[in-house]
Amino acid sequence: MKDTTPIYFHSATYAHEHGELDQYRASHKANIACKEAIEQAIADNYRDNRLGPACVQQVLQQFDYGRIFYVLANTVRQKDHDGRISRDNKAWAQTVPVCEDKDGFGYDRNVYFVVDRCNPGLTDLFLSQARRECTPVQEQKPSVRDSLNKNAGQQAAHSNKTKVNKEQAR
């Protein structure tokens, strides 16, 4: 059964101040479960120095791409110094919004959902595979920005034709 808990994009402090601790805790718990699912999938699908193609699908049975990418972006950011993670994936991780979440002592709560039971190189391979598999899904859905730009371009072309027709009529 797929976890449908929404990702909570704020810190525990914010959640406490706004009476949203239940949502924060549920999301944090789901992040940890997703991290564990990723680690298990890598362990199950790594054979003969290869990460099997079913690896990402195993995690997708439990979580959607949003949660998987949130956990992986957090992991890559926490391991930014590690040379076994590609520059491309490090750059990608910076584009995913991950909330900074420090406790009263300054300790980062996000470390609880860092994929760390497997080699960072395997985590990098998993992330690359997940990004490749997700791309066709995203290409099927046009972005809102592209749709708006396309409509604006069509409207501009239509208004230019109207101006030309009015000028020709004069």
Predicted regions and their residues:
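Gram-negative host-targeted secretion-system effectors, predominantly Type III and Type IV
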Residues: M1-A169
